[in-house]
A protein has these predicted regions:
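Anion-binding (especially nucleotide phosphate/pyrophosphate-binding) glycine-rich loop
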Residues: 24-27, 34-165
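Structural signature of FAD isoalloxazine-binding scaffolds in flavoprotein oxidoreductases
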Residues: 64-65, 69-76, 103-121, 170-202, ...
């Protein structure tokens, strides 16, 4: 789950306007000029900057094209340099964490991709107050286990969720009856527009079911959570149950978790609607609706992102025909001409 599902395009210009990742994907003269400008501004970051960088390997779908320009950020102090490059060049920006909720078009992304990876994986737990501060790069399963071992409860649900804290905040990740909003107090973000850090309270994040008001220019740096005092052994048992359930009910392989948002959380699930439409196992090219869980799409080795989008489009149309519900993507779609349809 790396970033939010509220924008289908998944990227925008550093000025806050939506960026067209389709425009200039043939690496037009205008794009080349913008890339040159950004690359010059990023020179201080040396080998961390790469042109025509393949993005598929940075996602759990393992498919997708290249970014016109890519920079791997390894420390917070580099972010102002990235902000300057994005602002001056006008390139759309795509922030990539663990790539667990991201589908990049085969044609790629005509902009600046910023790879955070494990930028920072610090966890500071205060057992007295049951609060903690977790850096954006912390993996959700790691935090779930650490908090449980510390005798804190309320974050066990995250043990089976791929992705990091940064992406989880951006999309208000959740599962097993809870989500980030349930324990989130505030987040520290870096704004690529003004080049500064800002602390935002939960009320300022516009958190909804698998969505937030955070956009591409907002780089989540850390999150402060309020949990409950609990029993370490009880939490450990709950974690084991969640892990066992996920192994039994969700597929492995190349996928990005739940594809569509549940239309009515707690009442109407996307998976049930897809199943009722008879689409379990339905295939388009290299993409198939999982036999194990209908709200998962699995991709073959050397698969195509465009097949995934085609299957998503077909599934949504069939579900709307059979149930009247119009599904919304939980995955971030980047670089597709018609990605805005989701």
């Amino acid at each position: 789950m790396s970033a939010g599902a509220d924008r289908a395009d998944g990227a925008e210009g550093a000025d806050g306007r939506a960026g067209s990742s389709a425009a200039g994907r043939d690496f037009s003269a205008a794009l080349e000029v913008a890339v040159e400008v950004a690359a010059e501004r990023l020179q201080a970051l040396g080998d961390s900057v790469q042109r025509d960088a393949a993005l598929g390997a940075m996602t759990t779908y393992r498919v997708g094209g290249a970014a016109a320009l890519f920079v791997h950020v390894t420390e917070r102090g580099q972010l102002p340099i990235v902000a300057d490059a994005a602002r001056v060049s006008g390139l759309p920006v795509l922030v990539i964490g663990r790539g667990s909720n991201l589908l990049v078009a085969d044609a790629g992304f005509a902009g600046l991709a910023v790879g955070l990876g494990e930028l920072d994986t610090t966890i500071d737990i205060d057992t007295r107050t049951a609060t903690l501060v977790a850096s954006a790069g912390v993996a959700l399963p790691v935090l779930a286990r650490k908090t449980a071992a510390a005798g804190l409860s309320g974050f066990e649900w995250a043990v089976g969720v791929p992705g990091s804290i940064g992406g989880a905040v951006r999309m208000n990740a959740g599962g097993h009856g809870s989500d980030m909003a349930a324990s989130l107090i505030e987040v520290l973000v870096f704004d690529l527009l003004d080049g500064a850090e800002h602390t935002l309270a939960t009320s300022e994040l516009g958190l909804g079911f698998r969505s937030s008001s955070l956009v591409a220019r907002h780089v989540v740096l850390e999150a402060t959570l309020q949990l409950d005092h609990g029993d370490a052994e009880k939490s450990a048992r709950l974690i084991s149950e969640i892990v066992a359930w996920r192994r039994a009910n969700q597929p492995g392989g190349q996928n990005a978790g739940s594809v569509f948002v549940n239309p009515v959380p707690g009442e109407v699930s996307a998976g049930a609607l897809i199943d009722a439409a008879g689409l379990r196992g339905h295939r388009i090219g290299t993409a198939v609706v999982s036999h194990k869980h209908a709200n998962f799409i699995q991709v073959d080795d050397a698969g195509r992102a465009d097949d995934v989008l085609a299957l998503m489009t077909y599934v949504r149309a069939r579900v709307e025909e059979t149930s009247g519900y119009r599904l919304r993507s939980e995955n971030r779609l980047v670089g597709f001409d018609d990605g805005g349809e989701f």
